[in-house]
Design a protein with these regions (language model features):
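Extended alpha-helical targeting/anchoring segments
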Residues: 1, 7-184
């Protein structure tokens, strides 16, 4: 756990996050996007909880859960296709946001922002967004992080958020390298 969190700063950061108008507006937009995505194939779509805070080693997140009852005979692959990518990686309106991402980002995101999971033989679908993960390709290790940039964004705050997200990955590399040296 981050030393700042254990020194009691976690509560300060939590209050700052909950009071941040941009973060709250962004989160509300993402919850609405999730509701809209699920409404395509679900009934009884509801928000189970809204804007809970979850602490991770280097970041604090606002977390909500949106759920619904999948309509009978819904194809799980179509359900995945119609809800992918998650709004947290695209923004809204989703189609236009994806067009802008394709236009402005200098390269394809690859595995980042994709998903990993399974579709069971019984139609069960379970997947997770591939963020804060490593990709090993041709002897090189790749990792990345991002954030929601909007007109109201504060550049320094957004950069710090990305660096905080990358902090856990950098820490994992440091720990792996130190174990490698011990075992050498």
């Amino acid at each position: 756990r981050d030393p700042e969190m254990s020194r009691g700063l976690g509560d300060v950061y939590k209050r700052q996050l909950l009071a941040n108008p941009k973060e709250n507006a962004e989160h509300t937009m993402l919850v609405d996007l999730a509701r809209n995505d699920l409404n395509r194939h679900c009934t009884d779509v509801k928000v189970d909880f809204l804007k809970d805070t979850q602490f991770y080693s280097h970041v604090i997140h606002l977390v909500s859960r949106v759920s619904g009852k999948v309509r009978p005979k819904t194809n799980p692959i179509q359900l995945l296709a119609d809800t992918f990518p998650a709004g947290t990686l695209s923004g809204a309106p989703k189609v236009r946001a994806l067009q802008l991402i394709s236009e402005y980002e200098p390269h394809n995101r690859g595995a980042y922002g994709g998903c990993i999971g399974f579709i069971g033989l019984n139609g069960t679908l379970n997947q997770a967004i591939t963020i804060r993960s490593f990709v090993s390709r041709n002897g090189e290790l790749w990792f990345q992080a991002g954030g929601g940039i909007v007109a109201a964004s504060d550049e320094e705050y957004e950069l710090q958020e990305v660096n905080n997200k990358l902090g856990a990955l950098r820490r994992a590399i440091t720990l792996a390298e130190s174990k490698k040296e011990v075992n050498a």
